[in-house]
Design a protein with these regions (language model features):
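Generic preference for hydrophobic/aromatic residues in regular secondary structure cores
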Residues: 8-10, 99-101, 137
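GIY-YIG nuclease catalytic motif and its immediate N-terminal context
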Residues: 1-81, 85, 89, 146, ...
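Structure-specific nucleic-acid interaction/processing domains
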Residues: 80, 116-170
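Charged, glycine/proline-rich intrinsically disordered loops and linkers
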Residues: 30-42, 102-121
């Protein structure tokens, strides 16, 4: 019985489907967008979608690049909305990557909610968010949930983004 309506066997995913998605991501890298394109849009607004030449948000995978270096691989059922959250939101729920990076720059023992109320930490948080805004982002659509989840791990390993990608569960 297929998981999440994925019609491929694991062997086919590993040998054909995921490499094909990676080839599309590699091609998308050539036309990566400035992350600043998403700044000022807290969601996938019509205005933002229009800027991106899209009519609707979409499920898929995205990669932040610092120059030529891949930094982070993410997935979402709503990629444009998720990128907007990373780059605009000021809380650890919606901007979890920014929070994680800021916690590396400003180690602390505080709970997440406490850290977000700490002025020094907030300064570091917004500095990190600004650093993320200076990057470029490439993305591809992946409609099937199982393919999308497997591809996140595949791409993170291929792109060596282990600094910020982790798959450790709670």
């Amino acid at each position: 019985m297929p998981i999440d309506d994925c019609q491929h066997k694991f062997e086919e995913l590993a040998s054909e489907v995921l490499p094909a998605h990676f080839a599309r991501l590699t091609e998308a890298r050539k036309s990566a967008r400035d992350a600043r394109t998403f700044v000022g849009h807290k969601s996938a607004t019509r205005e933002l979608l229009s800027l991106l030449n899209l009519t609707d948000d979409f499920p898929g995978c995205y990669v932040f690049y610092d120059g030529e270096t891949p930094v982070y691989v993410g997935i979402s059922r709503t990629v444009v909305k998720r990128l907007s959250q990373h780059l605009n939101q000021d809380n650890h729920y919606s901007a979890s990557l920014v929070y994680k990076m800021a916690s590396e720059d400003y180690p602390h023992e505080m709970k997440r909610d406490q850290a977000m109320k700490d002025e020094q930490f907030r300064r570091v948080f917004f500095d990190v968010q600004e650093r993320l805004r200076s990057m470029r982002v490439a993305y591809i659509e992946i409609d099937n949930d199982l393919e999308m989840y497997l591809f996140e791990v595949y791409a993170a390993m291929r792109l060596d983004t282990a600094t910020w990608n982790t798959f450790r569960t709670h």
